[in-house]
Amino acid sequence: MSRKNVLNLINTIVANSCKCPAHSHNYGSAAPTGVQTGQKEYAFEMSASTVRFGPGVSVEVGADLRNLGAKKVCLVTDRNVAKLPSVKVALDSLARHGINYEVYDETRVEPTDASLWHAADYARQNEFDAFLAIGGGSVMDTAKAANLFSSDREAEFLDYVNCPIGKGKEISVKLKPLIAMPTTSGTGSETTGVAIFDYKRLHAKTGISSKYLKPTLAIIDPLHTLSQPERVMAFAGFDVFCHALESFTAVDYRERGPAPSDPSLRPTYQGRNPISDVWARFALETIRKNFINAIYEPGNLEARSQMHLASTMAGVGFGNAGVHLCHGLSYPISGNVRNYKPAGYTADHALIPHGLSVVISAPAVFEFTAPACPDRHLEAAKLLGAKVDGVRASDAGRLLADTVRGFMQRAGIENGLRELGFSSSDVPNLVDGTLPQERITKLAPRAQTQENLAQLFENSMVAY
């Protein structure tokens, strides 16, 4: 599909899709009606899954499902994770408490619309009354989709997908209990109401977003992290890194837009707020102390435990405040991968791990956003270990960008988009793929033009 046809399709969808503040976009032709008060936003709300953390806590999952009244559970995982001790521990716990289950292990690393629909179809063919997700973000997001579409058997796939690609329908059906047990320290999906996937038709990432998608319970067991390969730890860790940085530097919730006429219409991503800041600060300090050790010392339970906790903490923070440009730019990067295959991954297809696609633009992004809130950027740099005494506000972006580059270099991250197979000729297509992500890019503290987006991609061709 040509770029022109893609943009025409997007504009057509926007003009005929949802008009609520949670999914509104500047480039639609029709204005929202009846859902905005015209009053400036004055409130934020905190919503998160119940979280249980502790080494070995996975043994409790059978009792949890029994207490939820589950009779037949869909255990969602992938074929690699299925071989790990974490799944055996869970299966033993289910058996010990008399819980019947079926295993779905066909999750795709970096899910697509087709892979999510495959899982949803599997769930629809069975009468599951609960879901258990054991794996990384791909597994947890797949479980969320399977839960949603098996609970609403009449729904078509695009009904719940975010505008402008989908219809952005609000979830009104009752979902089944979902317990999430992350085995990687990255996405924070165990606490968020977001499921992300590649929409192959447009070579772009999008997702389904609703507070009702949040898992019922997140079981955070640091023992699972000891099986993370080095590169998985590095790439997933940079997702935590950017979740914390982006939520901490997002637009203030009072500046996001007008207040909704009904509190149920307040968007999932609301902008930074005093509560989300607590989680982001904790995550950034924890990253400073533990990230590099967690990458290169796989047996260091303390470092890996702390990164596992930071992942959840950052997830709670960004799950309410939102993310912005690093994630917005990442979706067309991963959606337009050609031949890149990362070391340490066993996937049979080309892929750019999510954390890598996010951090690759981070130095350029934070140099761009810093003029809008330099104090925030200086504080973030300080939390990550930079010396900020005497640094001028005008240098805040450079300092934070250099701090990010330092972590990237120490972690052995690829040096920019060129090393992922991109060139300047790809920039127009990457910009086009970013435009549908306005749901999150509008949360950046500084507004962007298409020319700004193009320059961010150009500046990310070489990271350091």
Swiss-Prot record:
<keyword id="KW-0496">Mitochondrion</keyword>
<comment type="similarity">
    <text>Belongs to the iron-containing alcohol dehydrogenase family. Hydroxyacid-oxoacid transhydrogenase subfamily.</text>
</comment>
<dbReference type="Pfam" id="PF25137">
    <property type="entry name" value="ADH_Fe_C"/>
</dbReference>
<keyword id="KW-0809">Transit peptide</keyword>
<dbReference type="GO" id="GO:0047988">
    <property type="term" value="F:hydroxyacid-oxoacid transhydrogenase activity"/>
</dbReference>
<dbReference type="GO" id="GO:0005739">
    <property type="term" value="C:mitochondrion"/>
</dbReference>
<dbReference type="Pfam" id="PF00465">
    <property type="entry name" value="Fe-ADH"/>
</dbReference>
<dbReference type="InterPro" id="IPR042157">
    <property type="entry name" value="HOT"/>
</dbReference>
<dbReference type="InterPro" id="IPR001670">
    <property type="entry name" value="ADH_Fe/GldA"/>
</dbReference>
<keyword id="KW-0560">Oxidoreductase</keyword>
<protein>
    <recommendedName>
        <fullName>Probable hydroxyacid-oxoacid transhydrogenase, mitochondrial</fullName>
        <ecNumber>1.1.99.24</ecNumber>
    </recommendedName>
</protein>
<dbReference type="GO" id="GO:0004022">
    <property type="term" value="F:alcohol dehydrogenase (NAD+) activity"/>
</dbReference>
<dbReference type="InterPro" id="IPR039697">
    <property type="entry name" value="Alcohol_dehydrogenase_Fe"/>
</dbReference>
<dbReference type="GO" id="GO:0019552">
    <property type="term" value="P:glutamate catabolic process via 2-hydroxyglutarate"/>
</dbReference>
<comment type="function">
    <text>Catalyzes the cofactor-independent reversible oxidation of gamma-hydroxybutyrate (GHB) to succinic semialdehyde (SSA) coupled to reduction of 2-ketoglutarate (2-KG) to D-2-hydroxyglutarate (D-2-HG). L-3-hydroxybutyrate (L-3-OHB) is also a substrate for HOT when using 2-KG as hydrogen acceptor, resulting in the formation of D-2-HG.</text>
</comment>
<dbReference type="InterPro" id="IPR056798">
    <property type="entry name" value="ADH_Fe_C"/>
</dbReference>
<dbReference type="GO" id="GO:0046872">
    <property type="term" value="F:metal ion binding"/>
</dbReference>
